[in-house]
């Protein structure tokens, strides 16, 4: 069997001086971080603040909700199924730092419909004493893997709706509330607000068999990069010396790029995933929702923008950073050098594995072929 993408990254044996220098720089940076010389203040304080989490009834979304509740946040979860929401909200309450002081709410909604997202934000604002939520974290969506040609056009559209449009609709609804300008007489100091997308490393490195899913995640990443620039127009309005009409608070965008996550959705995905796809990602060790949530929250607390949850994902990000903002110019530059060297071998190997699979097994006849 040919090596998979992650195994190539893991098993690479750098011998050239340039690669050794990159590893040395990364090792030094890691030591510095471990000993706290570059410690930063928490940029994601959630105690007493209201957080909306879409897809919060299970998987990563539920884990995020539980961990933010542990930190003292008021939690609103959104999903379609009432029973799952009711069960999840009890688990989230059980994780609360102070269940008598914190507040919890759930809303059943179809996020593929923009009017539903508007309804959610209106309902949360009323529930939150007339104030919009402070943080919105988009975790909704599921993956339907398959070969592009073997997948129906309707499924391709459904994946774009479920993955991209649920996030875009949610972002549009909350930003239209957050970014309404107010007069100077009504302006008062407010903590920074946060909009968080949950994407996938497939937005960095597409893999055969994810044709319905990867384009939607790539679109989400493009939206995030665009908003990261556009939001500065509104943040800049608050820096005006005249303090004319401006938005009430600064807003920061973050995007999380997990790999496999052990969840009910992952189990369903595995049942229909092409065998070639499983081979290509065989060394990808899925993480638990709790682990992904913890790593993501810690990264947001450090103020990071594009967030990966394991080393392989970091290397994949390094190969596709392009013009995206860096978390650390030093670390991301070093990772980018390493990634570009590694992917000189990775990309040809992915294509070779696909070719050899076709030579051995012939034309696929179903999404699970």
UniProtKB/Swiss-Prot annotation:
NADP(+) binds at residues 52, 110, 213, 217, 261, 263, 272. It is found in: Endoplasmic reticulum membrane. One of its GO terms (biological process) is 3-keto-sphinganine metabolic process. Gene3D superfamilies: NAD(P)-binding Rossmann-like Domain. Pfam families: adh_short (PF00106). The chain crosses the membrane at residues 195-215. InterPro entries: KDSR-like (IPR045022), NAD(P)-bd_dom_sf (IPR036291), SDR_fam (IPR002347). Its EC number is 1.1.1.102. This is 3-ketodihydrosphingosine reductase tsc10. It comes from Emericella nidulans (strain FGSC A4 / ATCC 38163 / CBS 112.46 / NRRL 194 / M139) (Aspergillus nidulans). The lineage of its organism: Eukaryota, Fungi, Dikarya, Ascomycota, Pezizomycotina. The gene is tsc10.
